[in-house]
Every structure is written in structure tokens, then in C-alpha cells.
């Protein structure tokens, strides 16, 4: 037995030999730190494993690291992100501090790179996206890490990144600059090792650039056994780019490893970079990061049953925001376990955020993780079994873009394949290929953007393809705005204003708004009414106004063409061929 008073909240469990502190059983040692051991622990009521970091007070005081530990605890308690290690509880005794943390079993990213060498591009990008998401979350909560390196990036059982070790982190105050030189030399920014003042986020992003280089190359951009020589290399900002590195990846790294922090890429620039956006999961950068208001009812019920309390007691503890309340701790453990234990962990982590759908142009199915509650896959399947008759089918291309951004994407895509179009309303156009001597009257396709019926749990919009109706054919030119390749200056202007990423705007769910065109369940609407209601809802800064002013009559379009094409057998075949060309353009990266 330990000396009396040493573990004032610890008792021996009868017949097991293990010690208990609070609601946790302390088991075997799984690691060692500078201030004590790291033990595996188990939450008694839920049975979930945790990591218990034991910090010896005397050792911390002797090494002068009390403030470092206090920073880590204070900052971790503020952070709740799927790619940052969770701190569930802090238990203090006269001699030790016990940090009950998320158990991350996959080891360090550093060991992983050392073992495998340069990582595949796709894997590196996935890790980097998760790192930037976590770092951005920290910065949004006014916390700068200041010691980002592969040794402080852990991998969980599903090979997801977990940012750890916030001991050198600091809380940022508006208007204040930091001056402490800290962090690991190989990953430290020039201003940090030069004892210059810095705001904070820029030093983390420099470190992220070094980490990305290390993942792609298996080596460091700045390395030398002699520290003064190493510092000189870092301050010069010169490093070798391997011939095998992708140009876009090299370009992104170069924007992050800028010696001048003013010129260094910020999070927004990184996220909008074309290399970074490939296969970017929506949950990493959601519109709403306020997950504190989301309560998983299933978990509330489970916790209430395990502790033999009412569900109101659990929700009351959550609303009181008492993070050390035993019901809050059990709730967070349950939620964390559900997210990490799911085989498709990406979708499970998406449920962590209050989001609509992780959708891209061209997605034709409803993904699991499409609502604001966790365990959605099971609920969707159960709902389909119970309500087979309520199943709704949609034919077309679904998107969760802002409707105006969707139409900008459509216009740019049509321009890329040299199509012509006539605008019936802001979200309804007629499209055709350019006339040729062989085919002077190409078949026309009607493209219309519909708001999906929210009553059927559908969110987002549907771009519908159809043949022309008589009413659409009869609309006089005076009531339409048409456009040809001569308006490319307007589109180029919009594209440049969007940093060249207009055609790859992130698909994000919208806040509630009026239907932008007939709902899928209300197909009839007059063009005038739809046009008027839509114009009133548009923001004046949108480039659609520029596109409108540049429209010319379709009758005046030049019919100059390149080499004549072979005639198409029928109007039906030509219609589907035109639709195929448009879809390919819309779905092109």
C-alpha cells in the first residue's frame, strides 16, 4: 500500500491488485515521460480505456516546468477537436497530478515516417489536412502550439492524426506579441530562433510546412548537426526540392516556408490551395464549429442507464458545462469511443460536427453522416426499413454549394467545353453546343437548379438535366440573357478574384433560405416569379451581376467553328451526348 495521504483519492481494488483513482482503474504502464509514468486506465462505469498521465509535483518543481504543465492543462481543457488529444479529467493529489486523456494507440508520426520513409502522396495529404484542421481550430481559440513536430503528432488505431503535447503552447491576446524562443530547432520558424517578436500562428504554419516536407520526402528541409549552421539554413529559407516532388506540393510548401512571416501563407491560403483541396473532407473545415450545443441522445440514454440516473440529470450536467462532473466525463468518453471505434472513422468524425453533407458536384447518393447526430448510419437504415414508402428519388447532380457558387461553377464548366447558353432566370439556363455547318441547329438542354425538399431530410440542391418544353422554347430573346465565348473576360475576372479556385469552391451546406427555384415537390412555377424572387435574395457583391451585364443575344452569336464533326444519328442520342459532355465538365477536377 502507498504511504497514507499520498493518493488521497486512491484505493486498492479488492482481488485485482490495481489502484483506483476517481472512477478510473489504473493498470499497466504504457509509456514514460519526464515527470512520471503514463498508465493505461479504464473507466469503471463505461469500461472504456484511457491514458492516465501521472505528473509528479516534486519533479516538475525541480525542473521548473510547473508553468509548462499548467499551460498544457489549461489549453487542452479548451479544445475539443477530432484531431487533438482529448483531456477528460484532471485529478490532483498532494504529490501528483493525474491527467485522464484519450488513449491514442498508433504511436508517433515520427516513428511511422522513420519506419516507412517517404509517405505516399495521398496519405501525406490526408495527414496534412487533419493537422491543418487541428491547428486552425487551436488558432481560432487563440491558442498557438509552438512545438509542432512529428514527435508530437500521434496516430490512432484508424491512422488519424491527434495533435498532442501542448506544454509549450500559449494563449494569444489581441494586440500582444510573443517573444519566447521555444520548440524544436529543425521545425522552428526563423523569427522564433532569432528572438524576434511574433504573433503566434505564423510559427505553427512554418512548422506545418516542415512536417509536410518530411512526410513527402522522408527527410527534413533544414538539418545539420551543428546548431549555428542549422539556424543559418533556417534563416536563409533555402532548401532542396526533390525532383520527384509534385509541383503543386512544392508550391504549397514554398508558400509556408517563407522567411518573412508577413509573406507566409496563412490557414485560408493553405486551405484554398489546389493541392490541399484534393479529397478534402468537409468535416475538417465546417461552417459551424460550435459543437457544444449538439447532444447525442443515444449517448445520454446510455450514460443514464449505466449510472442509474435520469436522462435529465445527464443533460443538466452537460448544460451546466461542468467538465469535471462525472456524468460529463462519462458522456465525453462514450462520444469519443463511438467516433474512434467506427470502422469508417471518417464518417464518424463528420458526425462530431453540426454539418449537412460531405458532398461534391456529382455525388448521387446520400452519405452516412448527413445529419447533426451521431450514429447516423444505423438510424438511416432503421428509418428506411420502417418507412419504405417515404423514400424519395432524385435524378441529377446534387451539390451543397451556395446556389450562386454552384451556378458560377456551371458557367465556368460550360465555358471550358465551349458551350453556349441562354439565361431564362438566375438558376435556369438553356445550353447547346456551338453550331457547325454539319449541325447548324444543335440540340438544346435545359439546366435548372432545384432546392431539395427539406421535409424529406434532403439538404442542398439538384442540378436537373432535361429536354426543352414548349414554354421554354417560346421565351422571346428580349426576355433572355444569352452569352458566348466573348464574355470570357467576365468569367476570368470572377475566377481570379477567387484565387483561381472558382471551379473548386468547397461544397458547404447553406443556412435556411427561400427555395431558389421550384421545389422538387412543386414543379410548376412562372419564370417571372422565380426570377424576381431570386434576384431579391442575391448579394450585390456576387459576380452574377457581371455575367448578366455581359450577356448578348444568342441570335447574334458567331457560328464560327473548328473542324466539322460527324453527324449524330438522332436528337435523342445527341441530347444524351450533350448531357454527357456537360457532366464531364462539371465533375472535372
Swiss-Prot record:
Coiled coil: none
EC class of the enzyme, as a word: transferase
Pfam family, one: AMPK_alpha_AID
Gene3D superfamilies: DNA helicase RuvA subunit, C-terminal domain, Kinase associated domain 1, KA1, Phosphorylase Kinase, domain 1, Transferase(Phosphotransferase) domain 1
UniProt-listed Enzyme Commission number(s): 2.7.11.1
Traits of the deletion mutant: Reduced survival as a result of hyperosmotic stress induced by NaCl. Double knockout with aak-2 results in reduced glycogen accumulation.
Stored InterPro entries: KA1/Ssp2_C, Kinase-like_dom_sf, PRKAA1/2_AID, Prot_kinase_dom, Protein_kinase_ATP_BS, Ser/Thr_kinase_AS
Role, per record: Probably does not act as a sensor that couples lifespan to information about energy levels and insulin-like signals. Together with aak-2, involved in the establishment of germline stem cell (GSC) quiescence during dauer development. Plays a role in the maintenance of glycogen stores which are necessary for resistance to hyperosmotic stress.
Protein name, per record: 5'-AMP-activated protein kinase catalytic subunit alpha-1
Organism: Caenorhabditis elegans
Gene: aak-1
Amino acid at each position: 500500500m502507498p504511504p497514507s495521504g499520498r493518493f488521497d483519492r486512491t484505493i486498492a481494488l479488492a482481488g485485482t491488485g490495481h489502484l483506483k483513482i476517481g472512477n478510473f482503474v489504473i493498470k499497466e504502464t504504457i509509456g514514460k515521460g519526464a515527470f512520471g509514468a503514463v498508465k493505461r486506465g479504464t473507466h469503471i462505469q463505461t469500461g472504456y480505456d484511457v491514458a492516465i498521465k501521472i505528473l509528479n509535483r516534486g519533479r516538475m518543481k525541480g525542473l521548473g516546468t510547473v508553468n509548462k504543465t499548467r499551460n498544457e492543462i489549461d489549453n487542452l481543457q479548451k479544445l475539443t477537436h477530432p484531431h487533438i488529444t482529448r483531456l477528460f479529467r484532471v485529478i490532483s493529489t498532494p504529490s501528483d497530478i493525474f491527467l485522464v486523456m484519450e488513449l491514442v494507440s498508433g504511436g508517433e508520426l515520427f516513428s511511422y515516417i522513420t519506419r516507412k520513409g517517404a509517405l505516399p502522396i495521398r496519405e501525406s495529404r490526408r495527414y496534412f489536412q487533419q493537422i491543418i484542421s487541428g491547428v486552425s481550430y487551436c488558432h481560432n481559440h487563440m491558442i498557438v502550439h509552438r512545438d509542432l513536430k512529428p514527435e508530437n503528432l500521434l496516430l490512432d488505431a484508424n491512422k488519424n492524426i491527434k495533435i498532442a503535447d501542448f506544454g509549450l503552447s500559449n494563449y494569444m491576446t489581441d494586440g500582444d506579441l510573443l517573444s519566447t524562443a521555444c520548440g524544436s530547432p529543425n521545425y522552428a520558424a526563423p523569427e522564433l530562433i532569432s528572438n524576434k517578436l511574433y504573433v503566434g500562428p505564423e510559427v505553427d504554419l512554418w512548422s506545418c510546412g516542415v512536417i509536410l516536407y518530411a512526410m513527402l520526402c522522408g527527410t527534413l528541409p533544414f538539418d545539420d548537426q551543428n546548431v549555428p549552421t542549422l539556424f543559418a539554413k533556417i534563416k536563409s529559407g533555402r532548401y532542396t526540392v526533390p525532383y520527384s516532388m509534385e509541383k503543386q506540393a512544392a508550391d504549397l510548401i514554398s508558400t509556408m516556408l517563407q522567411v518573412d512571416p508577413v509573406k507566409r501563407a496563412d490557414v485560408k491560403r493553405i486551405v484554398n490551395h489546389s493541392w490541399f483541396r484534393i479529397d478534402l473532407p468537409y468535416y475538417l473545415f465546417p461552417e459551424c464549429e460550435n459543437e457544444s450545443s449538439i447532444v447525442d441522445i443515444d449517448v445520454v440514454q446510455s450514460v443514464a442507464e449505466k449510472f442509474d440516473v435520469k436522462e435529465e440529470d445527464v443533460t443538466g450536467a452537460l448544460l451546466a458545462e461542468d467538465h469535471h462532473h462525472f456524468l460529463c466525463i462519462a458522456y465525453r468518453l462514450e462520444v469519443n469511443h463511438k467516433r474512434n471505434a467506427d470502422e469508417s472513422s471518417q464518417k464518424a468524425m463528420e458526425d462530431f460536427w453540426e454539418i449537412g453533407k460531405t458532398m461534391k458536384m456529382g455525388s448521387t447518393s446520400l452519405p452516412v453522416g448527413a445529419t447533426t447526430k451521431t450514429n447516423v448510419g444505423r438510424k438511416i437504415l432503421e428509418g428506411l426499413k420502417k418507412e419504405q414508402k417515404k423514400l424519395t428519388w432524385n435524378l441529377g447532380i446534387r451539390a451543397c454549394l451556395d446556389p450562386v457558387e454552384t451556378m458560377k461553377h456551371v458557367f465556368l464548366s460550360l465555358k471550358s467545353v465551349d458551350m453556349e447558353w441562354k439565361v431564362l432566370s438566375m438558376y435556369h439556363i438553356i445550353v447547346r453546343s456551338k453550331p457547325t455547318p454539319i449541325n447548324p441547329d444543335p440540340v438544346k438542354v435545359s439546366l435548372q437548379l432545384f432546392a431539395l425538399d427539406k421535409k424529406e431530410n434532403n439538404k442542398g440542391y439538384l442540378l436537373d438535366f432535361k429536354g426543352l418544353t414548349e414554354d421554354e422554347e417560346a421565351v422571346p430573346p428580349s426576355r433572355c440573357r444569352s452569352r458566348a465565348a466573348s464574355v470570357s473576360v467576365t468569367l476570368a475576372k470572377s475566377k481570379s478574384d477567387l484565387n483561381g479556385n472558382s471551379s473548386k469552391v468547397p461544397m458547404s451546406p447553406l443556412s435556411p433560405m427561400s427555395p431558389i427555384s421550384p421545389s422538387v415537390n412543386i414543379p410548376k412555377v412562372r419564370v417571372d416569379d422565380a426570377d424576381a424572387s431570386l434576384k431579391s435574395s442575391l448579394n450585390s457583391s456576387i459576380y452574377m451581376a457581371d455575367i448578366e451585364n455581359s450577356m448578348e443575344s444568342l441570335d447574334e452569336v458567331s457560328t464560327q467553328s473548328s473542324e466539322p464533326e460527324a453527324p449524330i444519328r438522332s436528337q435523342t442520342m445527341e441530347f444524351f451526348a450533350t448531357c454527357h459532355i456537360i457532366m464531364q465538365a462539371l465533375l472535372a477536377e
